[in-house]
Amino acid sequence: MTRRYWNINLEEMMEAGVHFGHGTRKWNPRMAPYISAKRKGIHITNLTRTARFLSEACDLVFDAASRGKQFLIVGTKNKAADSVARAAIKARCHYVNKKWLGGMSTNWSTTETRLHKFRDLRTEQKTGRLNRLPKRDAAMLKRQLSHLQTYLGGIKYMTGLPDIVIIVDQQEEYTALRECITLGIPTICLIDTNCDPDLADISIPANDDAIASIRLILNKLVFAICEGRSSYIRNP
């Protein structure tokens, strides 16, 4: 895997608050190598380590995107949801930003059935068939469609399991992470000072609570994916 320059700037990360961790009482001792200091009761992440692992993650997604691989971005907490959707849409990735439904990947056949139902209902709505049904039936199907749009809208074009999963918050998305580990799907994970750095394939130590921090990390990864996709288009 070729190393590239991704313009990862320590000052920019500081401005985004990437270095702010959790309170010292909430830390995971396994994060010790990634912590540079304690300040006013909170741990401070070593941004040099952040830059190193973010750069490795960018190299990985660039390489994967240049070979036509598919990505899934997962981040369901309120602070991350909008940034996840915007990043995924920009890079033409799949995403889950409302709730990870248990078994979404490990029980893919069930997810696939739901997606087929979702696509059928969308087609019926677009063609006006729903409005020609009795009111009660139409209302029930519209509620189903709304529910499916909320939870599966970001993966509506998925036709199989993703090649790489990017996870915004390890603790919040622990079920998704465990499913990826079970299936052997490579993962890139933002990890705060209360997380386990050994679970994901690439763990990026960073503030997973601040919107600016989440957005900065996602923007770097998305840029690398887009660059990789451009390379794939030029050299299919």
Swiss-Prot record:
InterPro entries: Ribosomal_uS2, Ribosomal_uS2_bac/mit/plastid, Ribosomal_uS2_CS, Ribosomal_uS2_flav_dom_sf. One of its GO terms (biological process) is translation. It comes from the Eukaryota. PROSITE patterns: RIBOSOMAL_S2_1 (PS00962), RIBOSOMAL_S2_2 (PS00963). One of its GO terms (cellular component) is chloroplast. Keywords: Chloroplast, Plastid, Ribonucleoprotein, Ribosomal protein. The keyword Protease does not apply. Its main location: plastid. Gene3D superfamilies: Glucose-6-phosphate isomerase like protein, domain 1, Helix hairpin bin. CDD domains: RPS2. One of its GO terms (molecular function) is structural constituent of ribosome. It is found in: Plastid, Chloroplast. HAMAP family: Ribosomal_uS2_B. Belongs to the universal ribosomal protein uS2 family. This is Small ribosomal subunit protein uS2c. It comes from Vitis vinifera. The lineage of its organism: Eukaryota, Viridiplantae, Streptophyta, Embryophyta, Tracheophyta. The gene is rps2.
